[in-house]
């Protein structure tokens, strides 16, 4: 199961440490750290999402990967074997912070909840508002309110 970086919401010690270590090198290269996922498994994966006003290229990802790898090699915060992936958020951009939800107000989103609300864990609708640690999503014409701490995963729905 993936672990997501959401400032102030359920961060483990490892995720806090990774965020602290990764943010400065990413920002020093001129990119925004959108979020991180640490997916535990047979071969674990540390996935880093970056963005910039000009978009992200493969070369940008390679630069960030090289810089972050150097930091992780020295600090060695992860005790299991893992793969490092650096990518843009893509069309189905994951949302990690309240600021991300606010930035994409009016956009369609898919949410997967940690705990079911009205016997449902998966929801899809339009982001209407963000109020502190709560978001309002219009689902089938009705406003539903979700706590950010209950959102396991959120992605924008690409519009073609």
From Swiss-Prot:
Stored Gene3D superfamilies: Ribosome maturation factor RimP, C-terminal domain, RimP-like superfamily, N-terminal
Biological process annotations from GO: ribosomal small subunit assembly; translation
Protein's UniProt keywords contain Chaperone: no
GO cellular component, one term: cytosol
Keywords: Cytoplasm, Ribosome biogenesis
Compartments (UniProt record): Cytoplasm
Record's keyword annotation contains Cytoplasm: yes
Pfam families hit by this protein: DUF150_C, RimP_N
CDD domains the UniProt entry points to: YlxS_C (cd01734)
InterPro entries: Ribosome_maturation_RimP (IPR003728), RimP_C (IPR028998), RimP_C_sf (IPR036847), RimP_N (IPR028989), RimP_N_sf (IPR035956)
Entry similarity comment: Belongs to the RimP family.
General function of this protein: Required for maturation of 30S ribosomal subunits.
Name of the protein in question: Ribosome maturation factor RimP
Organism: Cronobacter sakazakii (strain ATCC BAA-894) (Enterobacter sakazakii)
Organism lineage: Bacteria, Pseudomonadati, Pseudomonadota, Gammaproteobacteria, Enterobacterales
């Amino acid at each position: 199961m993936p672990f997501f970086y959401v400032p102030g919401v359920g961060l483990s010690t490892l995720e806090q440490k990774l965020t602290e270590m990764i943010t400065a090198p990413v920002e020093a290269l001129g990119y925004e750290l959108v979020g991180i996922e640490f997916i535990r498994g047979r071969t674990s994966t540390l996935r880093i999402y970056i963005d910039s006003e000009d978009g992200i290229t493969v070369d940008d990802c390679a630069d960030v990967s090289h810089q972050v790898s150097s930091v992780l090699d020295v600090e060695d915060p992860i005790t299991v074997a893992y793969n490092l992936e650096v990518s843009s958020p893509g069309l189905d951009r994951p949302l990690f912070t309240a600021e991300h939800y606010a930035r994409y107000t009016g956009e369609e989103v898919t949410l997967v909840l940690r705990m079911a609300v009205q016997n449902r864990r998966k929801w899809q609708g339009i982001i209407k508002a963000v109020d502190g640690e709560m978001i309002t999503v219009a689902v089938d014409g009705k406003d539903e309110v979700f706590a950010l701490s209950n959102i396991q995963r959120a992605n924008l729905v690409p519009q073609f």
